[in-house]
Amino acid sequence: MLSPKKTKYRKQHRGRLKGACSRGNRISFGKFAIQALEPAWITSGQIEAGRRAITRTTRRGIKIWIRIFPDKPITKKPADTRMGSGKGDPKFWVAVVKPGRMLYEMGRISESVARKAAQNVAYKMCLHTRFVKI
């Protein structure tokens, strides 16, 4: 699963999911893409599940670009712990996704197979997506 090798700080504020995506909202590498239509946090496990769904649907000869990276740590306190005593330890990593962001791009593949792969990825994601082509 994806996670940063090294970060400047172990913990981050939660932040807010406001506005639309201004970077990463165009197709840059492949011919087809999967675009987010709503804001969400996508975990590294969900990103990997989407990648597996694409590779299983398309089999050989496809090129996949993952356009998001989980660089935000999410902390959790242990169960049965009283309030206070600081923030919890980092448990998993998420990518902050805003509407318009390209999640995956695909190349060297027919449009019909790419559409089927995009549909399979949509089942794995926690947000609404759409299929985009050049």
UniProtKB/Swiss-Prot annotation:
Keyword terms: Chloroplast, Plastid, Ribonucleoprotein, Ribosomal protein
Cross-referenced SUPFAM superfamilies: Ribosomal protein L16p/L10e (SSF54686)
GO molecular function: rRNA binding; structural constituent of ribosome
PROSITE patterns reported for this sequence: RIBOSOMAL_L16_2
Family the entry assigns: Belongs to the universal ribosomal protein uL16 family.
NCBIfam families listed in its UniProt record: rplP_bact
Protein known as: Large ribosomal subunit protein uL16c
Annotated organism of origin: Gnetum parvifolium
